[in-house]
Amino acid sequence: MTTGPHSPRARSGPSWRFLAEVLALAALGVSAVSGCGATPVAGSGARPSTPVIRASLATSIETSAGSWATVAMGHLDQPLNTFWQLLFRPPGAALWSDRASALAVATNGGLVVATHSGRSLAIGIRPTNHLDYSPLIVTSDARSWLPAGPIGALADEPDALALAAGGEAMALVSDGRVTRVLASPGGLASWRQIATEDGLATSAAGRSCGLVSLLAVGYAAGQGLIGAGCSRDGIVGIFASRRSAWRLVGPRLPQSLGNSSAEVLGLQTTTRGLCALVGVTVRRSTKVVAACTSGNGLKWRVSPALSLAGPQHLVSFGPAGDLGLFVMISGSAHRDILAVLGEPDVSWRTLPSPPARTAVVVFGPAGRLDALAVDGTSFTDWLLAGGDRWKKVQEFHVAIQFGSSG
């Protein structure tokens, strides 16, 4: 576990008695979930399903309680010595605090966060070491932390968890062999299986895009959506359920991208609708585009492409307040590329390159923009003070107990 100079006391988190109960019930809960819905098709691990573009779990999100961000710290080349932190800053406050200790669960596997309209934050803790399930915890004020029912292992994808306005939720889970989509009718207490990777791939909708992997879940106008990777040229794999059947509702890529396959990296709710971040493979090059809706319909507009050249990779992405969506791409000479997708024109605008080692940026209230940089156990908050000047406003070290998860 980790602590920091602004960490709340441990009693603010779920009790260890609760965690013992979770451990005792996890096998039963996961088994019950596995038994619900359709039976997975055998051999689901046979198809290649590794995304071409890997998206980090690092992200930021706004709720009524304040600003949140998830970052990995420690020895990032050692999975059991990588510890994910949950950073929080209340409205009007100048400093961040580390709330990872409130989760009271080892965070080596990563954190997946979700909200709807900023009312509350749901945190899913990906399994690590010998665990094979994901605890879920919900907070609306960063002080009270309510445990929800554990589910199967959340997939290693940024948008593996999604919440809807009515309290419904979707989750993407994977045991390394079978990838499934689960749904909760409300409260995150009970889950049922609504789709599997193999089941969707062999359906008429899945075959029409050449589905190879499930990568994200989300909601648009209250309708649950699944984002996928597809092998057929120019088809973006976004699926919606209608009358107990899944249908392909994603857009086609513009002809300017030529013969290209696409994978949905994320499904992000914006103030205007939904934006899907899509990785595109064109011959030997990779690009990123966004496909966005507005209003209650699923009429898509596709953005121009951002190119990932050579060793460049996707550092992080997330909501950018009223602006829409941000994407950060690694650059040369420690100068990463930060781009914001504007709505409704669906075009990219480049912002000043964030400082070195920035893991994620945070679009806060009143136009505030922070870059959160990490280096081992060191955390630094940089504020865009005007023009292209970043100003250091906070720095602290997180006390990490290396070797505690091995």
Where are these regions (language model features)?
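C-terminal motif of bacterial Sec signal peptides marking the signal peptidase cleavage site
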Residues: 33-35
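Bacterial signal peptide processing site
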Residues: 37-39
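Short loop/turn motifs that cap or connect beta-strands within the blades
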Residues: 48, 99-105, 148-154, 194-205, ...
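Beta-strand-rich domains and repeat architectures in extracellular enzymes and scaffolds
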Residues: 48-84, 107-112
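Repeated scaffold domains used in trafficking and secretory/extracellular systems
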Residues: 54-62, 105-115, 153-165, 202-219, ...
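Entry beta-strands of beta-propeller and related beta-repeat scaffolds
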Residues: 64-71, 118-123, 167-172, 221-227, ...
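Structural motif
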Residues: 78-85, 129-136, 177-182, 233-239, ...
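Conserved Ser/Thr-centered positions that define the repeating blades of beta-propeller domains
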Residues: 89-90, 138-140, 184-185, 240-243, ...
